[in-house]
């Protein structure tokens, strides 16, 4: 299934991939990996696993986050080795390492890559966006409203806010073409690229053509879950398929319901 705004196939059956989404529209990463023909290349771009409350670069995975990543790895077990890349954050690198451990890879290398930094959909540094919206609901609210083209704000504030974001559909197509497909030939058949919610939230909305509910600004206040993201699948016939995927049991989370491991 294609849409004029999206340059890629969104129906796995068209590419000979027998896999079904869950009730929320997400495809399980393990199911996708098993269903994709062995001649196809796959790149998974996902959010890191559950991390400590600190948002700085040194924030580590929590015990639950370590287990989540290793459980995901156990669903991706095979004889082939994967390519792993992360941003320059401890939590993204640890996510790669623990997925590899779950797969049984003991010597996996994790490449640090700026190409998957969280600010891809922004025209300004993320700190600039934070400064503008910190007292008006925070960046998650406005990143989601941007992705769904539902920004609600006073005209002058809205004009400034809109200028901080790239054009949504062209930028999504550009990411798949220039960040993923342009580099696939130098990666292994399967790649795990671990980034942040600021990148993954818009990507999921993009590849689902705004059909998945991650509207944190309205009830049920859903946001991209840890280990959720997209799969980009390329076959020998030149068909490129993009799918929203999840590495955990559900693709979304509600921030207020997140388990606080610091009080356990």
Placement of each model-derived feature along the sequence:
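Hydrophobic, Leu/Ile/Phe/Ala-enriched alpha-helical segments that form helix-helix packing faces
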Residues: 33, 72-76, 96-103, 129-136, ...
